[in-house]
Amino acid sequence: MAAAEMERTTSFDAAEKLKAADAGGGEVDDELEEGEIVEESNDAASYLGKEITVKHPLEHSWTFWFDNPTARSRQIDWGSSLRNVYTFSTVEDFWGAYNNIHHPSKLVMGADFHCFKHKIEPKWEDPICSNGGTWKMSFSKGKSDTSWLYTLLAMIGHQFDHGDEICGAVVNVRVKGEKIALWTKNAANETAQVSIGKQWKQFLDYSDSVGFIFHDDAKRLDRNAKNRYTV
């Protein structure tokens, strides 16, 4: 008999003996079988009833954020409708969340859905994001679901050589289609940013060129901001 099977069998026998003693008001048989360990009844019942679940921790904890601003809130204070949805730190908790949230093709028009490292807010003003920038990919309407998933898996799975440079990712749902952006924290680090852009394209098998815009440029120039790096 295998050691693991033996352990289960002896534990089960011991628990059964305890239950029999409790039911009859009697004492546990003093003559224990070889290798048998008798625990207190509560402990034995707990052992039998416990579901053993092994979880696999991620390199970092991550938080999903949702934003569906109205035109008014955009004008008054960008991010005022941003809300924290769920924080996860294991593979299993990620899938539990992902399988119970709307994917980009099912989100309402104008929505932004973010996944950022825990305690980093998806805002230019966040101190970790403030000196960074974004890589951005465009997709036809309803065609970004798989790429969004692959982006999340590569990001939370620490598949990027410069993964510590990554703050998070966001998918924007708009009338003309969806955009997925990777936010990084040090835009001036060209080596790291170009590496991230190239690997991201490889992970998603994305054939079009993608550009990187500094947050500072985006804040100053808005839609007129130009790509600093292109891959």
Curated annotation (Swiss-Prot):
Protein name per its UniProtKB record: Eukaryotic translation initiation factor 4E allele Eva1
Family: Belongs to the eukaryotic initiation factor 4E family.
Gene name, Swiss-Prot/TrEMBL: eIF4E-eva1
Protein's job: Component of the protein complex eIF4F, which is involved in the recognition of the mRNA cap, ATP-dependent unwinding of 5'-terminal secondary structure and recruitment of mRNA to the ribosome. Recognizes and binds the 7-methylguanosine-containing mRNA cap during an early step in the initiation of protein synthesis and facilitates ribosome binding by inducing the unwinding of the mRNAs secondary structures. Key component of recessive resistance to potyviruses. (Microbial infection) Susceptibility host factor required for viral infection (e.g. Potato virus Y (PVY)) by recruiting viral RNAs to the host ribosomal complex via an interaction with viral genome-linked protein (VPg). Displayed sequence is the allele Eva1 that confers resistance to potato virus Y (PVY) by failing to interact with the viral VPg protein.
Organism domain of life: Eukaryota
Region (EIF4G-binding): 56-59, 66-102, 150-159
GO molecular function, one term: RNA binding
PTMs per UniProt: According to the redox status, the Cys-129-Cys-167 disulfide bridge may have a role in regulating protein function by affecting its ability to bind capped mRNA.
SUPFAM superfamilies attached to this UniProt entry: eIF4e-like
BP term (GO), one: regulation of translation
Organism: Solanum etuberosum
Region annotation Disordered: where it falls in the sequence: 1-34
Lineage: Eukaryota, Viridiplantae, Streptophyta, Embryophyta, Tracheophyta
Subcellular location(s) of the protein: Nucleus; Cytoplasm
